[in-house]
Amino acid sequence: MENEKKSGDKYSKLAGNTLIFAISSFSSKLLTLIVQPFLTYAMAEISDLGLSKILSQYANLLIPFVSMGMSNAIIRFGLDKGNSEKQVFTNGLLTILGGFGILVLCWPIAQFLPDMAQYGLLIYIYVLMSCLRTLCTQFVRSRQWNKLVAVDGVLCTVATMAFYVLYLVGFKWGANGYLLAIISGDLSSVLFLMFTGKLWNYVELKGVNKDLWKQMLRFSLPMIPAQISFWIINASDLFFVREMCNGLDGRDGNAWSGLLSTGYFLPTILTTLGLIFYDAWQLSAVTEEEGRAKFFTKIFRTYSSVLFCCAAGIIWLCRPVMHIMKSNYYYAWHFVPFLVLASTCSCFN
């Protein structure tokens, strides 16, 4: 009887965490679902949207190197009650600042990369703010302040949407405005978590625990190749399409990248489900120890069934849904079935 109760508690806890993270993650992904049609009208040309996506993916490629994969270590070591919360947070912060310092030193070389000379400053700020926001949200999650995570997700979504409207519709800043809106949204999130969670109390620069730091790095550094692999799977196609399709059907490379990124609009629903579940699963996978094999098997079967049903529905509805985009983006529906299949496989990773 007692074992059944404990088993039920495990499922209830996972369901509760999933619901809380759904509020947080769904709000941020809802932003993507709302913003993508909005961007097709706010951007003057398809190529402007394509360039914006390319620039943001430059930043996303740099993030694992700057953070050194520390976001994973924050959860792993933050949940371990034997570690000092202050040391975990401080080590994560110092790692990110050190990684960003190395990135700054690489500027003389980085400026010669495509688009970097014109947009490099914004890309660098984007990387730093994204790393800091991830640090704060992961630490708050490791403290199991899950409701605060949910509120932060909603706040960041609203703030970013407001900045999109301000920079793209009000100031008409194009690609610059797109990057600035994301930067401003991340900054809003960092400030909110800092003040509500009083995270400055967890910064302890004196007596840094170097042994713990080494353990965290040993855990996080092997994650970098995995994160880069995810980037290659999910984002490198934008760069290949830009170079290989340049001039095809009278469109430049950025325009084709813009169409492809619009095609990601519906598969984002699948990746959203996967990310929501993964955030909750991280906690249960670490904290639940009894009956793990049966628990894991049952959850995987349910998870895979939901994914396959959603994938089939998205492919069925892709053409009519694409009518909500600006008319010259309708061609993007051709990409959707292939991207849905790829997203389904990615969710199982």
Could you say what each language-model-derived stretch is?
Residues 9-71, 103, 107, 126, ...:
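Signature of the first transmembrane helix
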Residues 94-229:
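Hydrophobic transmembrane helix module of multi-pass membrane transport proteins
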Residues 15, 53, 83-97, 217, ...:
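Interfacial transmembrane-helix starts/ends
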Residues 46-47, 110-126, 251-254, 314-347:
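Interfacial segments at transmembrane-helix termini and the short loops linking adjacent helices
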Residues 17-32, 156, 178-197, 210-283, ...:
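Transmembrane helical elements of multi-pass membrane transporters/channels
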Residues 37, 66-82, 263, 267-293, ...:
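Helix-loop junctions and terminal segments of transmembrane helices
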Residues 42-46, 142-143, 172, 254:
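Helix-loop interface residues and adjacent transmembrane-helix termini in multi-pass membrane transporters
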Residues 21, 49-50, 87-88, 119-122, ...:
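Alpha-helical transmembrane segments and their helix-entry boundary regions
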